[in-house]
Structure formats: structure tokens, C-alpha cells
Amino acid sequence: LRCKYCFTNSPKGDHVKEYLDIKAIKKLADEADELGYFEFDLQGGELLLQPKKLFEVLEAIRPERFYMYLTTNGYYLDKAMAKKLADYKVSRVSVSIDSMDEKIHDEIRGRKESWKRAVEALKHVQDAGMDPYLNITVGHYNANTEHFKQLLDYSKDKKYKTLLNVAVPSGMWQNAENIICNDNDR
């Protein structure tokens, strides 16, 4: 997708040229386990764009040691992928939805049908036995809108947990000070 606020798509996001190799990820997970960490969160960019790499990372982490969760836009999370994530002991999947209005969500995400796929992804997560979280970015642009209230109602109605992320001027929104919540956004 081409989400309007993604750090990865920003000019400053171009600096990431190297990634941790599998050996380094395994070492990091082993150290986290030894130190008593119990959660492992995978996010950033879109993990499901490279499913082979994602499952290599999960194998290196050995998720059975942790409460394992990941965040996705849901575009590539179909029923088979949800089952595979559950088989790999992923406990929770957060799917980002920006509005219950399909057109608004798709505009923010930069791709048609992204809303439909995100909604379906949450159902696939729930059906696979993982904890579905509706991931909502909250900013001045939506804090007091009916769209925001509809998202919260939808999450409650479907028995999803809700994860609220406060918008900050970063990534493609680096200079967008108007996105930050202010005193009127309560």
C-alpha cells in the first residue's frame, strides 16, 4: 500500500539499507528470553509482503517462548495466512483500519479494496484462534469525528480489542503539525 503516514515511504525512511540477519534475530530472541521478556512484537512496513522471510524470522524467534504479536494492514492476510500464523504460535494480530468509510480508508491507504481486505483479515485472525486487535491511528484529523466513533463501535460489536496509536508528525507526515491532537480533541 501507499499509506499517507508511513515512515517507510518517507524520504527519511530510505535510510534503512540493511536488516538484521536471521542469526542476529535468533541471538536477540535468545537474549530476550534469558532476560525474562515475555512479549515480542513484529511491525514496521508490511511484514506479509515477504511471507517467506517472515516465517524464517518466526522460526528464529521461536514464538512459543513469547506472547507473539504482529501488526499488518491486512491486505495479504487471507484465511490460509491466518492459519499459518496461528500454527507458528502468533498470539495476536493487529490490523490497521483508518475509517469505517471504505472510501476514506482506501484513500488514506492508497489502494482500492484495502478496507475490505482489512475487515476480512480481522475475521480470519479471530477464526484462526488468535486475538484480533483493531489498530487505529488517532489524530486531530479524526479524534472527534463520527468515523472514529464508528471504528470503536465496530471493534466492540465484533469483540475485537482496540489499539489506539496517537498520530505524530513522522514519516510522510513529518511536517504535518495539524495531525497532532490538541486540547479540543478530548
What are the functions of these language-model segments?
Residues H15, S96-D98, K103-R186:
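Radical SAM enzyme [4Fe-4S]-AdoMet core and its adjacent flexible, acidic
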Residues L1-R92:
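Conserved alpha-helical substructure of the radical SAM core
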